[in-house]
Amino acid sequence: MMSDQENENEHAKAFLGLAKCEEEVDAIEREVELYRLNKMKPVYEKRDAYIDEIAEFWKIVLSQHVSFANYIRASDFKYIDTIDKIKVEWLALESEMYDTRDFSITFHFHGIEGDFKEQQVTKVFQIKKGKDDQEDGILTSEPVPIEWPQSYDSINPDLIKDKRSPEGKKKYRQGMKTIFGWFRWTGLKPGKEFPHGDSLASLFSEEIYPFCVKYYAEAQRDLEDEEGESGLSADGDSEDDDGSLGEVDLPLSDEEPSSKKRKV
């Protein structure tokens, strides 16, 4: 019969063995994910070149993506529509120091004359341990500079002189909830920055970018169906269609994100 000390030693060996097995699992999972990312990289590059030849590709994808609309205020779509290039790159392909979940997103905005400057912006996202040392870590980022539209001057955090007054606080909150506020998101200031900024970043890296062709095809089918229905209704009743979303100016109260597909 084993003594208590011997039992403790056996348990310690078992736990040590389990820990080593978990390390092996993590290493294999990383190896598999790196293999997948390496195989997909040239395909994405070739696909992106074809996308560049299709007018308003990203406008159509983003306008018709319901989940994306849940994060975006209706008034922002005027500027979202100027995005003509999106590229996601996984940092682990560049260096072993990165987690396979670390990535960057690059946007090119063609701009709006007299209001919004043409520009390209890259935002990097990395997994880091949180204060409570979560096992999987949390997604974080660093603020990156982006030129805001002139029409947003009143809610641009950099231009609000008195952020402590009730009016200043209100405008600051409005600005931080715009898509431009998302470029300031860090993941380290809950309640004080763009809401659910990590989820929006993951939406780009896990859904919108990898499956953009599928979403584009679905959007095209939806638009064709709408055009067909419009043709039929034109011959019949002429009821008002209140299902579409137009541009909405920011009201004094916080504007809610859109949650429906838009007509392009």
Curated annotation (Swiss-Prot):
Pfam families named in the record: NAP (PF00956)
Gene: VPS75
Function description: Histone chaperone which acts as a cofactor stimulating histone H3 acetylation by RTT109. Preferentially stimulates histone H3 'Lys-9' acetylation by RTT109. May also stimulate histone H3 'Lys-56' acetylation by RTT109. Assembles nucleosomes (in vitro).
Domain remark in the UniProt entry: The C-terminal part interacts with the N-terminal part of histone H3 and promotes acetylation of histone H3 'Lys-9'.
Disruption phenotype: Decreases acetylation of histone H3 'Lys-9' and 'Lys-23'. Simultaneous disruption of GCN5 abolishes acetylation of histone H3 'Lys-9' and 'Lys-27'. Abnormal protein sorting to vacuole.
GO CC, one annotated term: chromatin
Protein name: Vacuolar protein sorting-associated protein 75
Modified residues (Phosphoserine): S3
Aminoacyl-tRNA synthetase in keyword set: no
Transport is among the record's keywords: yes
Biological processes annotated in GO: double-strand break repair via nonhomologous end joining; nucleosome assembly; protein modification process; protein transport
Additional facts recorded: Present with 3120 molecules/cell in log phase SD medium.
Region (Disordered): 223-264
